[in-house]
Regions:
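Intrinsically disordered, low-complexity segments enriched in small/polar residues
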Residues: 8, 45-47, 73
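Feature detects long, helix-prone N-terminal segments enriched in hydrophobes
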Residues: 11-13
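Generic preference for hydrophobic/aromatic residues in regular secondary structure cores
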Residues: 4, 43-45, 64
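Negatively charged, low-complexity tracts enriched in Asp/Glu with abundant Ser/Thr
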Residues: 1-9
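A short, structured beta-strand/loop element
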Residues: 15-51
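C-terminal structural segments of small proteins and small subunits
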Residues: 49-77
Length: 77
């Protein structure tokens, strides 16, 4: 489960067995978790985060999208 980025309490990562899915990033903080598709950036699923946190996470994903895609492509190619 490669961690790509940490920002505050948020950890951005993907699972090493998810190469068959489109590029995406998971975000975890404590017991809360979300998954964002990267092309385009869209929330796929969320458990525990409130709407304010999801807005913040979406902005972080958009700001680091190229970094996440680069990590994804390097890992799975």
């Amino acid at each position: 489960m490669p961690t790509v980025l940490r920002v505050g309490r948020y950890r951005f990562f993907f699972f090493s067995n998810e190469s068959e899915e489109p590029a995406h990033i998971h975000v975890k903080a404590g017991g809360d978790e979300a998954k964002f598709w990267l092309e385009p950036v869209v929330l796929a699923v969320s458990y525990g985060f409130n709407s304010r946190e999801l807005s913040e996470l979406e902005e972080l994903v958009m700001n680091h999208r190229s970094e996440f895609l680069e990590a994804w492509n390097e890992y799975f190619s």
